[in-house]
Amino acid sequence: MKNLVYFLVCILIISCKNEVKKTDALGVVEFQVTGNNEAQASFEKGLLLLHSFEYDDAREAFLEAQKKDPNMAMAYWGEAMTYNHTIWGEQDYDAGFLAVEKISHFQDSDLYSPVEQGLIGAVIVLYTPKTAKLERDVAYKNYMKSLYKTYPENQEIAAFYAISLLGSVPEGRDDAIYGQGAEIAKKVLEKNPNHPGALHYLIHSYDDPYHAALAIDAANSYSKVAPDASHALHMPSHIYVALGMWDEVINSNIDSYQASLNRMKRKELDNNARGYHAYHWLEYGYLQIGEFEKAKQMVLDMESYAKETPSDRTNMYLAFLKGTYLVESNQWDSSIADMDIDVSNLHLTAQAQYYFIEGYEAFVEKNAEKIETLIEILSAEIDKESLLVENISDGFTVCSSLSRSAPTQSNIDQSLIMLNQLKALNGWLENDVLNTENLLKETILQEQNLSYSYGPPVIQKPTSELYADWLITQKRYSEAIYQYTATLERATNRRLALEGIEKATKLSVQGKMEI
């Protein structure tokens, strides 16, 4: 009998252990909301996923919570929050507004805590009708600030206030505001080091070469805290790229991309569920350590994914991977250079990247006529975008949904830099020394005014690096070294800049020996 009892206890222990293994590893939140226990579990899963920007899966969990308890107000709040992608500049306004309509009657009910009512009020502000997106973002931030002052110990209010600060910056980075977000996230982590949102938002707050070291602990922790969120596995590489830690960049994005494949298989999804963002960063990591063949195969695989499941998204990432590979490998005679990609439906910056790559290939082939044609095409696209941005600033759009293809001043500024790079390449090809140098110097100044571009650079060939390459052809080696070194200020341990310094130094020594 004792043996039977012992056997049953062992089975029970093993069963419990197996159950623990099946639990999603998404981090830890301490937030009890009004609703039954079954719905609470679904809500908590949705909240954890929301903090890791796994918006589709978070929405699925929140909708599940609504079914389990139709009176759980916070489940509707969560659904509405999944339609607003703060850092990504995306919002499905119509879907979010419909979710808010389901939630509004809960706001003043005595059934819900003041914290719940406060968060419901905040999301209603986020989807205020007939109000421009930036105004809503700022109003939401201010609302969250007031909640934070009232409930400074509430970790969820603190976390969402931190991310609202980042979301209130219309374009690029604002170090002062991002610093505020970081300080709030750090306070949450002091109490709960496994909070996925605080870890995530701290990384975003310090995501540039000048601050990245301040988030290295968060980067090292986040993927361990929330390994079942693909984005949590990718996010540490933001800090690793900023610090030039290429092995870590590679490992992070191998894990993140594999997690997306696991999810794709589990949910029986098509290629659009692949983590192309992590895939692109992985390619960039390989190229920084000279793994050209691995990177090339990735571009070829991306081409096959785009053919199997054609979409604007796959075309965009194919263009990204093509451009990154060619710039970083300098293998312009590769078959990759001959890939034709339809970029007509992509946002302006993606089009400009593609036209720059086509122009650089024409430069290598000494085809000035093609460069001039590309300059005309890109100039026309910039003019169109400028008109759209002007209309938006004049109030022609208010509550329409936003996506990354929406016209922005940042897109124009980035594209003007690539346009000037094309003009400089044309001048270089025509041996117009004065015009080429003036264009490159002017463009460097323009690029310095841009916010830091995390990850694979948006300006795929940094202008200071391009200028340094040109200076070498003019035998101005010390100036070239200076420009390559300047490139490293925003691109830590960038391989081409480091190799450029080495090359210019050797040529300089040889030149002195010949004298």
Regions found by a protein language model. Name each.
Residues 42, 76, 83, 118, ...:
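TPR repeat positional signature
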Residues 55-57, 79-113, 121-135, 168-176, ...:
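Inter-helical turn/loop elements of alpha-helical hairpins
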Residues 67-68, 108, 148-150, 189-191, ...:
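Solenoid-like repeat scaffolds
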Residues 72-73, 154-156, 195-196, 229, ...:
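Residue-level recognition of tetratricopeptide repeat
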